[in-house]
Swiss-Prot record:
The keyword Membrane applies. This is CDP-archaeol synthase. Belongs to the CDP-archaeol synthase family. The gene is carS. One of its GO terms (cellular component) is plasma membrane. The chain crosses the membrane at residues 7-27, 55-75, 78-98, 116-136, 138-158. It is found in: Cell membrane. It is a multi-pass membrane protein.
Length: 166
């Protein structure tokens, strides 16, 4: 297979995670996953930006993409996409947890962490489920996520979906 084919395939493999991660900002209010609780350091666990409603939307959109992908691959992709979406959101929540520990408020910027937390979460479950991802596919997805995150967040800011352009 060609490198171009492998890179396009990696986009298809990671598409549920990208869709799940990108769907969260459309939910403006909801029940915080941390129920407003603080960690031992006195700061919120995740913050108001991580809600059950946002998680449900992310899982729904990511899994729906997986159902479509399963028509081209195998039926297993419905389950894989659900778990990939879930782990992408877990990665995103871990990123929020780290930011809160560093004293960075909701909407605060941490270059690298903001763009790659969901990719790392999705990659973990893909590896555990034995989905064949090469290192260059992984690095390509990390680069793509980094630049797409910058662009899509700026557009979301212009459309008043997000409060900050990052």
């Amino acid at each position: 297979m060609s490198i171009a084919y492998d890179l396009l395939l990696s986009i298809l493999i990671y598409l549920p995670a990208f869709i799940a991660n990108g769907s969260g900002p459309f939910i403006k209010r909801g029940t915080p996953i941390d129920f407003g609780k603080n960690f031992v350091d006195g700061r919120r666990l995740f913050g108001d930006g991580k809600t059950f409603e946002g998680l449900i939307v992310a899982l729904t959109f990511g899994t729906t993409v997986g159902v479509i992908i399963s028509k081209f691959f195998t039926a297993e992709w419905t389950l894989i996409s659900f778990l990939e979406s879930l782990f992408a959101m877990i990665g995103d929540m871990i990123g929020a947890f780290i930011k809160r520990r560093l004293g960075i408020p909701r909407g605060g910027r941490v270059l690298g962490l903001d763009q790659l937390d969901f990719v790392l979460g999705a990659s973990l479950i893909l590896v555990l489920m034995r989905v064949n991802i090469t290192w260059y596919q992984f690095l390509f997805i990390c680069g793509l996520a980094f630049f797409l995150h910058q662009g899509t967040n700026y557009v979301a800011y212009l459309l008043k979906i997000k409060n900050v352009p990052w």
